[in-house]
Amino acid sequence: MKLADFVTYVFGSLLAGLVTLKVLSSFIPSLLVTLPAKVRLRVNNSLLKCSNNLNRIPVLDFGWKNSSVRRAFILASERPSDYTNKIYGDRVHIAYNDRIKRESFVNKLGFDSKRKLLGFFHPYCNAGGGGEKVLWKAVETSLNQDKNNICVIYTGDTDVNGSDILNSVRRRFEYDLDSDRIVFIFLQKRRLVESKSWPKFTLLGQAYGSIILSIEALTTLAPDYWIDTMGYPFAYPFVSLFARIPIVTYTHYPVISTDMLQKLKTMPGFHTNFKLIGKYVYWKIFMLAYKFSGLFVEIASTNSTWTYNHIKSIWSSTKNIHIIYPPCSTESLIEGCDKSDPVKRLNQAVVIAQFRPEKRHELILSSFSSFIDATTKKDLIPKIIFIGSTRNVEDREYVETLKKYAFEALKIPTHLVDFKTDCKYDDMKSILYSSWFGINAMWNEHFGIAVVEYMASGLIPLCHASAGPLYDIVVPWDSKKNEQSTDKANETGFFFIDETDPDFLAKDSSKYSSLRTLFAQVSKLNTVQRIDISNRAKMCSLSKFSDSEFERSWNEVLEELNLTHNRMFS
């Protein structure tokens, strides 16, 4: 092929791609929301056929228009939650309450509604972790902000129904939500975003999977706003270009960061290892794609200073970036804590973290074992209680591995370590209120909601010196002025580092001790010292990380969204 022919071919392909993109971006939005012809007549006829038996459920199939019909039904319905796709899949049924009020329901179909659909894309909404707490508090705040707001939850938790999920939310987080205005859309292709589905090129595979999953979500029900509370950025161009939906993000941690690139680059033999160089190039290209996805974000919010700095660097073109600390229910935790007597707390430490390797449970166990072997004052040795949720078989197997490591490899006495999986919230609070210390060992924990729960419950946090706990949470606090301080005498907890940290050599080892040394240090604190630190920590957690503070910040996001929406349609 001649050079001129090659150039012509390339430019021709690009032009064809742009034309196709233009056509699709103008056609697909109307496809997702415009109702098929004579839809009211068809719905009315179906309802009339069932008028003699209201228990008979009309189930309609409008083909590729099912998404727009489901949307219209939700906007017109007495109880929007009835229009989940749990039972009938892509087809759309007519709910009992709307069958009773046939004429009113049919007349509302297709007409302008003050209602808005806020689509929360969170494929693991039933996981029960800190990310899910953010999701459900955002949902609660959105519902309370305006009676016309309807929250759509896009989830892959197909083994349960909507009621099961909301009951779990009530038990775990004590959020009592208006279930009538929550619509669950169950996604069948969640496996495509699971790492086990992509043993090679995992990041690329999960990015592709998130695009497919978002398309499944949009073609089932298109919302007015796309709110990603879990972190699937590669879907944004498709949501924005093809559905023309404003995008709001709540980022817990970047998909890929400069820290990851730097860590890879500083590995021994990097410059002569073609495999590492290839991986670096692969990640670098991935970073460029991540930057590109930020172009389509209307409002970005992050959970911490560490995450904010990374996102601001990566999505430099996104102007609206905020820090919104996660809701940590510090109000209720402190209320319960104040009812307990600190003098009666037990000499025990709590570790609240999902049972995953990156939470570094093994580091805690090995450090604890070393402390036990080294100390001569055996009466000062605390008990450690590990509390965490298990998402799947892999997590449960990991717990068994930890038990073997603790009791067989390290020979830690069984009465000094306890594992509690999928613990009820009330049980967890009881353990917190009766303990003195809380441990968080994860390196570069983007936020650390468990650390806040420690502080609000009156525990003294022992945290790895990085990211959220270091920059945002365990900060000196002036109890007289009730504000953040620079005086180390106002400490609210303690930090440690470990030689297994990726950035260990860059840290000042004289400034931070090891966890083993920290165990010895805090075990010597007297009751008065413990109570002073505990009180400062409680004040800090209430001022910075309460549910009411999250509500205030999230309402500001919703107000910005409404302004954007009004500008678009004015």
From Swiss-Prot:
Keywords: Endoplasmic reticulum, Glycosyltransferase, Membrane, Transferase, Transmembrane, Transmembrane helix
Lumenal side: 1-7
Localization (cell): Endoplasmic reticulum membrane
Any single biological process term in GO: protein N-linked glycosylation
Intramembrane positions: 201-221, 447-467
Disulfide bridges in this chain: none
Protein topology in the membrane: Single-pass membrane protein
Cytoplasmic-side segments: 71-200, 222-446, 468-570
Catalysis performed (reactions): an alpha-D-Man-(1->3)-[alpha-D-Man-(1->6)]-beta-D-Man-(1->4)-beta-D-GlcNAc-(1->4)-alpha-D-GlcNAc-diphospho-di-trans,poly-cis-dolichol + 2 GDP-alpha-D-mannose = an alpha-D-Man-(1->2)-alpha-D-Man-(1->2)-alpha-D-Man-(1->3)-[alpha-D-Man-(1->6)]-beta-D-Man-(1->4)-beta-D-GlcNAc-(1->4)-alpha-D-GlcNAc-diphospho-di-trans,poly-cis-dolichol + 2 GDP + 2 H(+)
Pathway: Protein modification; protein glycosylation
GO cellular component terms, A-Z: endoplasmic reticulum membrane
Transmembrane portions of the chain: 8-70
Function noted in UniProt: GDP-Man:Man(3)GlcNAc(2)-PP-Dol alpha-1,2-mannosyltransferase that operates in the biosynthetic pathway of dolichol-linked oligosaccharides, the glycan precursors employed in protein asparagine (N)-glycosylation. The assembly of dolichol-linked oligosaccharides begins on the cytosolic side of the endoplasmic reticulum membrane and finishes in its lumen. The sequential addition of sugars to dolichol pyrophosphate produces dolichol-linked oligosaccharides containing fourteen sugars, including two GlcNAcs, nine mannoses and three glucoses.
Name used for this protein in its record: GDP-Man:Man(3)GlcNAc(2)-PP-Dol alpha-1,2-mannosyltransferase
